[in-house]
Regions:
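Short, amphipathic alpha-helical "recognition" segments used to contact nucleic acids or chromatin
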Residues: 1-6
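Short, basic interhelical loop/turn and adjoining N-cap
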Residues: 7-28
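RNase H-like nuclease fold core
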Residues: 23-128, 132
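Conserved beta-strand -> loop -> alpha-helix junction used to position metal-binding or nucleic-acid-contacting
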Residues: 117-120, 126-156
Length: 156
């Protein structure tokens, strides 16, 4: 059994089908995408409350066209299945807090540590949504700031 992913285009020639029509049929009927209960808000936020754990990380990233997204992930998953706790469009504190408040209070209270950068907005989000969590600044940003400070001292 082949375990590598395939595209509709790769099926076009051997099965004599039109790839565009097959893709559309898959999305509209076979995949359940149109009846997905998260579809109405998926463009703005997705929250996977079952993935929450005692150690989380929060960061912002640009996925496409410069659009920023806030991503909260469970560190215990090490980037694998169950890592994403939430993906929220934008970095505005109000929007992110509103999405994270959909996670029940007792689930959010289980979070003991959140790793983040020096961002004030991220700090505010963590304080509002995970009141019992200790904030840890990630090593990359600490090292970068130390290096930058050393460079400034060296240049003077």
């Amino acid at each position: 059994m082949d375990t590598s992913p395939i595209t509709a285009r790769s099926l076009q020639k051997p099965y004599h089908i039109k790839a565009d029509e097959f893709e559309r049929a898959y999305k509209d009927f076979l995949s359940g995408y149109r009846t997905w209960k998260e579809l109405s808000h998926a463009e703005d936020w997705l929250v996977f409350y079952k993935n929450i754990g005692p150690q989380l990380s929060i960061d912002e990233t640009a996925l496409s066209d410069g659009e920023l997204y806030t991503i909260i992930s469970n560190k215990a998953a090490h980037g694998g299945k169950g890592a994403i706790v939430a993906i929220i469009k934008g970095t505005k504190v109000e929007d992110v807090v509103k999405a994270l408040m959909r996670i029940l209070w007792y689930e959010r209270a289980k979070v003991l540590e959140v790793t983040m950068d020096f961002s004030e907005s991220m700090h505010s989000i963590v304080k509002q949504c995970f009141p019992y969590a200790t904030i840890t600044i990630d090593r990359f940003h600490v090292q970068k700031d130390c290096y930058d400070a050393m460079q400034q001292v060296r240049i003077r």
